[in-house]
């Protein structure tokens, strides 16, 4: 399952990038309860992060395999407590659109386990709330 959303944001790319890398990154996403970097700054390839989701029911340990400072980073989940996901990866791309605007493209790719496949529509809906919440955070109309 692959989901992608693009957001045209009326903020400089550097501001959006800093938010995505902040200590409280993604605090606006309802299904994420705690996002904690487990690597020291400055971040780069090899950075790790832990995320608690769904009221702490799911813990994800993420490993960043791509880091292009100020522009793009990508990670895969190296460990999760959820029996529903066989693999999960995300890519964040921030592209300037002039001095005071940017485009943020967020891609999520998930491979469900045999147990998770019957719940694909529910999993898709839950993951899409990340996009809806992000649109609201940036003052955009959710798609």
Map each language-model feature to its residues:
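Hydrophobic-ligand binding "helix-grip"
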Residues: 28-31, 54-101, 109, 140
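Hydrophobic ligand-binding cavity/cleft-lining segments
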Residues: 1-41
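Beta-strand elements of well-folded, non-transmembrane domains
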Residues: 9, 81, 110-114
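A conserved amphipathic terminal alpha-helix motif
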Residues: 103, 108-143
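A structural signal for short, well-ordered beta-strand segments
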Residues: 3-9, 92, 106-108
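A short, glycine/Asx- and small/polar-enriched loop/turn
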Residues: 42-47
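Hydrophobic pocket/interface hotspot
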Residues: 16-20, 25, 49, 64, ...
């Amino acid at each position: 399952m692959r989901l992608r959303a693009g957001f045209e944001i009326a903020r400089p790319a550097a501001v959006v990038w800093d938010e995505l890398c902040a200590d409280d990154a993604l605090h606006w996403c309802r299904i994420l309860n705690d996002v904690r970097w487990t690597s020291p700054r400055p971040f780069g390839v090899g950075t790790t992060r832990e995320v608690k989701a769904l009221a702490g029911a799911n813990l994800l340990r993420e490993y960043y395999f791509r880091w292009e400072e100020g522009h793009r980073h990508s990670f895969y989940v190296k460990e999760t407590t959820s029996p529903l996901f066989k693999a999960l990866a995300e890519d964040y791309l921030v592209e300037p659109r002039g001095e005071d605007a940017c485009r943020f493209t967020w891609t999520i790719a998930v491979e469900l386990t045999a147990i998770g496949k019957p719940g694909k529509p529910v999993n898709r809906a839950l993951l899409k709330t990340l996009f809806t919440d992000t649109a609201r955070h940036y003052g955009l109309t959710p798609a």
